[in-house]
Amino acid sequence: MSEALSPDQGLVEQFLDTMWFERGLAENTVASYRNDLSKLLEWMAQNQYRLDFISFAGLQEYQSWLSEQNYKPTSKARMLSAIRRLFQYLHREKVRADDPSALLVSPKLPTRLPKDLSEAQVEALLSAPDPQSPLELRDKAMLELLYATGLRVTELVSLTMENMSLRQGVVRVMGKGGKERLVPMGENAIEWIETFLQQGRSLLLGEQTSDIVFPSSRGQQMTRQTFWHRIKHYAVIAGIDVEKLSPHVLRHAFATHLLNYGADLRVVQMLLGHSDLSTTQIYTHVATERLKQLHNEHHPRA
């Protein structure tokens, strides 16, 4: 028999359910919130606080405690984001008359530029899979689609047949916060997807049926982690330093290379599914740094 939840744990679970069902937060985000908020509840229990009466000063105490635990600034910022959302919810649901988290100050974060690949490196990465193998033909189509669309890895591995129109050349994506967007695929990606659908997909599915466009070797939905391992495998073949990579390396390359060729920032924002333009603007810094590097390497007076 499972252990009964405390009142505070019950409130957190109600909050997480709301984030999941009504706000459309991704499973990974909800799991992260649950983990972060469990730390808060544990600290509160040890210090005789409850969610319905902890004050701003109490939350500041918790913030100080987090600093003493040597968490990275990014981790502390993420934890404070979860706390703010929780207390906004409790205030909205009238569990509390106030929101004690409203004045909490987040740690200052260094600007982190996305890891950048040159066009030549992207070409090498896209050429690494052997399309004679059904598995690598799938990977080739996935890599081409990632670079052509800038999808998030979670959006790619969960892409279904009904959300892709090869005739119209677009994919329909349900992004963060349940926001839907249409993204054009480009001829190259379409050709490789068609080849995979005709020659490789049925071999991976075997006797199983699935609406997932890119099934795993067992005919099921691939995990993000599995695809990340595949990217690293091809990076080694392409002679790319794995340290330069992240799971979203082709999403970053998509955005940076579009901007390098003069794409409008707001168009790139729309294609990436960013709700805030400032999130997209970071790619302009990458593009600028790349231009400076090229200038330094090739200009006679640099």
UniProtKB/Swiss-Prot annotation:
Q: Which UniProt keywords apply?
A: Cell cycle, Cell division, Chromosome partition, Cytoplasm, DNA integration, DNA recombination, DNA-binding
Q: Does the keyword Calcium apply?
A: no
Recorded GO cellular component terms are: cytoplasm; Holliday junction resolvase complex
Task: List, from the UniProt record, the residues annotated as the active site of this protein.
Answer: R152, K176, H248, R251, H274, Y283 (o-(3'-phospho-dna)-tyrosine intermediate)
Spell out the family assignment given in the record's similarity comment. Answer: Belongs to the 'phage' integrase family. XerD subfamily.
Anything further noted? During infection by the bacteriophage CTX-phi, it is required by the bacteriophage, which uses host XerC and XerD proteins to integrate the bacterial genome.
What is this protein identified as? Answer: Tyrosine recombinase XerD
Question: Source organism lineage?
Answer: Bacteria, Pseudomonadati, Pseudomonadota, Gammaproteobacteria, Vibrionales
